[in-house]
């Protein structure tokens, strides 16, 4: 006899699809994350163990009553979604286990066998969400990258066309950075969608979000705690990506509806990461460099899928990984577009990558950055015996100006943002400085504000008052002049592998100066220390920040990933104790006492470790603020309080502040010197295994609105500043050459 | 050819009011046994099932089975144009892409008809199995609506706990907690005011207030409401429509977590 208890809701259409539906074990899916199982089910009698919390104890008396009683009622239960995809019977069981336990971080992970979506060839979003979840719980950077590479490897092997969306979703981008396509969904909109989908109240969600500090988690909890009548079809990576792009492009009510419809289909941790993607913060600590490394490792794993276990690959094929990573990073720095790179790595040999992904005008390449020095002496120490050139370091905005064969001009910022719309005046007069036949070019330059009457450079603050968008050429008040200092591409030829002296020669051949509009950066080729010193003083008089020092012939190419010899910058304030000020992130606040009651009295500052992608404490600070400053900081930071330290903050418990902040603001800080500290964690492991570096007598200088927290001073730079102190140098004779990648001004 | 005629437009109005908050659009499945509608709300948390038997209509004719996808908002607009006492007739040709709704005043002096475009909705049809419920509670519909409305002020979810003694609705939130207990009525004088509990096993389940309050929009249709519950199974809230059929709402329970 068919017991009513074992029945459950099912799609009527299923009956026709599957002539004899196998007996399924109905059960309510507590986590709503089994894509292939009945989600809701009927009553007792099922072999499933009922969650105890949900049942009240049943007295024997009641039990006996139970049997004869028959209030025949229909009940609801749901069934499997697509009969055609995953089988309902035994395979359903297997896949269920795989889905729930999908874990690309295990040592035994096999990119093929454990890719449970093999037969479908469509990467489920849940697999990606699971990967993110595991990565979020992982501490070590290498392990995180390895986990991601396992997932990527599976995608490459099983569903390669999903690799592009998977990669974009992993770094939470919708398109190459320079296209500037951003989601921009307000948190309240998301909250409303969550309310609608789970029957909750907006006020409750708001207060819970405030408490937990992450709408993603709130969304997941809300999702998981409300069962559904019928689970919509599982999401897959490419649809999610496509929908996110749609969401970014539309506005108004329909945006909210799209979010809502997607959210309804989210299960378990999908809800968390979907919402985080929409907010714009994935919080898994994977950024561009880690991602490229993970891709490289995945490629190597793919090549050696039969040779050995995936977990062994990183050890056995170390060299191949290093080589692949370099090739990939090189290609990415000249062609920062995954839409081009990823199909290329899937189709061609990695060694051909550079030819397959050439640079071309209209697509920004990563700019060469400079590292700070303390003085002329240090420059000569570092560049000893090489031919060098010094250029004035203009105080303006870095600009990469592109012109393609069709004559279209685009202008990109230091961070590869498209600034073309900001400078219609430059585009209007862009013909003037060409000399001879120039069809296409990429130049590297600095745009500075220009006083037309007095013919002189104006400070950066003037430039920053220019409108950013919808600039009307008639209404421009701040005139600009472009100082060109490098040429990276001319008439279809990339010049990045040429030396600076050659590039400069070509620059002078093809371009000419136009007074007040286009100028070449004032330069001096000299190896005389006194001349450099004098040139520096001249540059300061010429309203410049200082000098940029570059090698002319040796290691003088423009290849970022290959680590061409870095440029150095010499700044006018190098005379102070520490060569440069530090730009540090405020991550915590201590409540003020006495006169400072009601505001924060001190703050906890951190530098950013780009390798580990974490913030490491470097000092507490309480001086250099006026009362007004404190008021302003307290108000601003008060809006960014989070309930607990971020997982990517490294600090000693003894430093626990009263309030933790989101890493939202960067301050310029000066200090007397740097010393090793048992409690601070800056650059820990670089200079000393146990101790970090801290600042002595830090003073607040100003807020660096132009930098975001990830552009703060890097741990390597801190280590380098520490080591280049005379005192330290005398102690340890063999100072290691620190390699620094990031700029620091 | 499909044709269905009801003596009073007011019933159809009330039915529309009872479902249009949950559903934006739905398919009316017509056969010679009557009209069926079954649809989940957008969030897939609740399900509405409406049955109108052919014998409840003044006139009912359905030559071939017909599925009519309708925008319920538009349908409600059309019904607003009817007087409560009007006769109402729904008509459609086989394979038509429109439905005609006609109102006739009681004295036959005014006849208005409205033609509405149909939609092609590919909604999932769910088979609803029969279940032995642990608890079935019958109570006055007004009372249930009142309880849901009151408790929603305290929390976003309501706990319904049914035991031998009676049924208890409770909610707790920032303000505090609210408990409403109903005992089984001793002697039944007026059937519509009775609270009747049939229980085999005690049940405690948690539901989102938002949906319960949406269900109570059906209160004008019926004096009594029937709640059927069983652990881990959706709640069924049924309103009988006198002589015509019933409307049932299914609601997936919430998973109680310890924090709330």
From Swiss-Prot, chain B:
The alphabetical list of record keywords is: Chromosome, Cytoplasm, DNA replication, DNA-binding, Nucleus
What happens when the protein's gene is inactivated? Mutant flies show temperature-sensitive lethality, hypersensitivity to DNA-damaging agents such as ionizing radiation and methyl methanesulfonate, suppression of position-effect variegation and female sterility.
GO BP of this protein: DNA damage response; DNA replication; DNA-templated DNA replication; eggshell chorion gene amplification; leading strand elongation; mismatch repair; mitotic spindle organization; nucleotide-excision repair
This protein's GO cellular component annotations are: chromatin; cytoplasm; nuclear replication fork; nucleus; PCNA complex
The residues forming the signal peptide are none
Q: Do the record's keywords include Cytoplasm?
A: yes
Please list the residue ranges the record marks as binding DNA.
61-80
Q: Which GO terms describe its molecular function?
A: chromatin binding; DNA binding; DNA polymerase processivity factor activity
- Which PROSITE patterns does this one have? PCNA_1 (PS01251), PCNA_2 (PS00293)
What Pfam families does the record tag this protein with? PCNA_C, PCNA_N
Q: Subcellular location, in the record's words?
A: Nucleus; Chromosome; Cytoplasm
Q: In which tissues is it expressed?
A: Expressed at high levels in adult ovary.
**Superkingdom of the source species:** Eukaryota
Q: Its biological function?
A: Likely to be an auxiliary protein of DNA polymerase delta complex and is probably involved in the control of DNA replication and repair by increasing the polymerase's processibility.
Q: Which family does it belong to?
A: Belongs to the PCNA family.
Q: Subunit structure, per the record?
A: Homotrimer. Forms a complex with activator 1 heteropentamer in the presence of ATP. Interacts with E2f. Interacts with the catalytic subunits of two DNA polymerase complexes: PolD1 from the delta complex and PolE1/DNApol-epsilon255 from the epsilon complex.
Kindly provide the name given to this protein in its UniProt entry: Proliferating cell nuclear antigen
Q: Which organism is it from?
A: Drosophila melanogaster
């Amino acid at each position: 006899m068919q017991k009513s208890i074992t029945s459950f809701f099912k799609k009527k259409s299923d009956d026709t699809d599957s002539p004899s539906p196998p007996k399924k074990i109905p059960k309510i899916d507590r986590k709503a994350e089994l894509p292939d199982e009945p989600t809701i089910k009927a009553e007792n009698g099922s072999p499933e163990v009922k969650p105890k919390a949900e049942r009240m104890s049943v007295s024997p008396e009641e039990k006996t009553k139970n049997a004869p009683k028959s209030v025949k009622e229909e009940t609801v239960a749901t069934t499997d979604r697509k009969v055609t995809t995953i089988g309902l019977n035994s395979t359903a069981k297997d896949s269920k286990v795989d889905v729930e336990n999908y874990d690309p971080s295990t040592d035994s992970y096999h990119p093929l066998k454990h890719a449970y979506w093999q037969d479908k060839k469509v990467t489920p979003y849940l697999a990606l969400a699971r990967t993110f979840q595991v990565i979020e719980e992982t501490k070590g950077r290498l392990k995180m990258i390895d986990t991601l590479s396992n997932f990527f490897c599976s995608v490459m092997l099983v569903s390669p066309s999903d690799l592009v969306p998977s990669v974009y979703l992993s770094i939470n981008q919708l398109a190459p950075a320079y296209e500037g396509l951003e989601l921009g969904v307000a948190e309240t909109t998301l909250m409303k969608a969550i309310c609608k989908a789970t029957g909750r109240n907006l006020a409750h969600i708001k207060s819970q979000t405030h408490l937990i500090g992450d709408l993603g988690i709130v969304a997941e909890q809300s999702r998981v705690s409300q069962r559904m009548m019928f689970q919509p079809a599982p999401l897959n990576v490419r649809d999610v990506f496509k929908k996110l792009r749609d969401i970014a492009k539309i506005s108004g009510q329909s945006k909210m509806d799209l979010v809502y419809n997607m959210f309804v289909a989210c299960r378990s941790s999908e809800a968390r990461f979907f919402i985080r993607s929409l907010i714009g913060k994935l919080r898994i600590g994977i950024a561009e460099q880690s991602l490229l490394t993970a891709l490289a490792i995945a490629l190597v794993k793919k090549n050696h899928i039969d040779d050995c276990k995936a977990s062994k690959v990183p050890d056995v094929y170390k060299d191949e990984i290093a080589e692949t990573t370099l090739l990939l990073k090189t290609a990415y720095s000249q062609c920062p577009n995954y839409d081009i790179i990823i199909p290329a790595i899937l189709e061609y040999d990695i060694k051909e990558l550079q030819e397959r992904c050439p640079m071309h005008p209209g697509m920004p390449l990563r700019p060469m950055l400079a590292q700070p020095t303390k003085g002329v002496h240090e420059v000569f120490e570092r560049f000893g015996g090489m031919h060098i050139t010094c250029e004035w370091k203009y105080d303006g905005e870095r600009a990469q100006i592109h012109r393609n064969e069709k004559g279209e001009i685009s202008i990109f910022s230091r961070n590869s943002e498209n600034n073309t719309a900001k400078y219609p005046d430059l585009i209007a007069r862009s013909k003037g400085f060409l000399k001879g036949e120039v069809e296409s070019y990429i130049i590297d330059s600095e745009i500075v504000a220009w006083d037309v009457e007095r013919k002189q450079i104006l400070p950066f603050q003037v430039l920053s008052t220019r409108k950013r968008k919808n600039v009307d050429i008639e209404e421009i008040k701040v005139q600009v002049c472009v100082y060109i200092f490098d040429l990276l591409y001319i008439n279809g030829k990339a010049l990045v592998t040429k030396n600076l002296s050659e590039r400069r020669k070509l620059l002078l051949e093809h371009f000419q100066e136009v007074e007040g509009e286009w100028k070449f950066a004032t330069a001096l080729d000299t190896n005389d220390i006194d001349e450099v010193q004098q040139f520096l003083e001249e540059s300061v008089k010429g309203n410049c920040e200082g000098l940029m020092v570059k090698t002319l012939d040796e290691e003088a190419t423009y290849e970022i990933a290959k680590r061409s010899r870095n440029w150095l910058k010499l700044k006018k304030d190098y005379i102070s104790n520490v060569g440069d000020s530090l730009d540090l992130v405020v991550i915590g606040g201590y409540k003020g006492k006495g006169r400072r009651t009601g505001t924060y009295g001190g703050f906890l500052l951190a530098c950013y470790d780009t390798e580990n992608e974490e913030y490491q404490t470097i000092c507490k600070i309480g001086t250099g603020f006026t009362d007004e400053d404190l008021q302003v900081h307290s108000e601003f930071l008060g809006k960014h309080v989070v309930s607990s330290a971020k997982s990517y903050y490294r600090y000693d418990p003894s430093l626990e502040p009263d309030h933790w902040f989101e890493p939202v603001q960067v301050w310029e800080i000066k200090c007397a010197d740097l010393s090793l500290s048992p409690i601070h964690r800056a650059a820990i492991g670089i200079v000393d295994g146990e101790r970090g570096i801290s600042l002595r007598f830090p003073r607040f200088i100003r807020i660096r609105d132009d930098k975001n927290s990830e552009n703060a001073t890097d741990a390597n730079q801190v280590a380098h500043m520490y080591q280049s102190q005379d005192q330290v140098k005398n102690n340890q004779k063999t100072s290691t050459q620190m390699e620094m990648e990031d700029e620091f001004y | 050819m499909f044709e269905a005629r009801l003596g009073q437009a007011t019933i159809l109005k009330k039915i529309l009011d009872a479902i249009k908050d949950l559903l934006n659009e739905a398919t009316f499945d017509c056969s010679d046994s009557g009209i069926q509608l079954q649809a989940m709300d957008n969030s897939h948390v609740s399900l509405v099932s409406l049955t109108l038997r052919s014998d409840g209509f003044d006139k009912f004719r359905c030559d071939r089975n017909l599925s009519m996808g309708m925008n319920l908002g538009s349908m409600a607009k059309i019904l607003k144009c009817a007087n409560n006492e009007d006769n109402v007739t729904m008509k459609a040709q086989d394979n038509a892409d429109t439905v005609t709704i006609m109102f006739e005043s009681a004295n036959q002096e005014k006849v208005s008809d409205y033609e509405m475009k149909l939609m092609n909705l590919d909604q999932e049809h769910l088979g609803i199995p029969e279940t032995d419920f642990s608890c079935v509670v019958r109570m006055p519909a007004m009372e249930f609506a009142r309880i849901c409305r009151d408790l929603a002020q305290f929390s976003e979810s309501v706990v319904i706990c049914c035991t031998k003694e009676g049924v208890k609705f409770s909610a707790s939130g920032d303000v505090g907690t609210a408990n409403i207990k109903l005992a089984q009525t001793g002697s039944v004088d007026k059937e519509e005011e009775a609270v009747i509990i049939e229980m085999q096993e005690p049940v405690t389940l948690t539901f989102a207030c938002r949906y319960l309050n949406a269900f109570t929009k059906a209160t004008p249709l019926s004096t009594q409401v029937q709640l059927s519950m069983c652990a881990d199974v959706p709640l069924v809230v049924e309103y009988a429509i006198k002589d015509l059929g019933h409307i049932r709402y299914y609601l997936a329970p919430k998973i109680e977590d310890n924090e709330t």
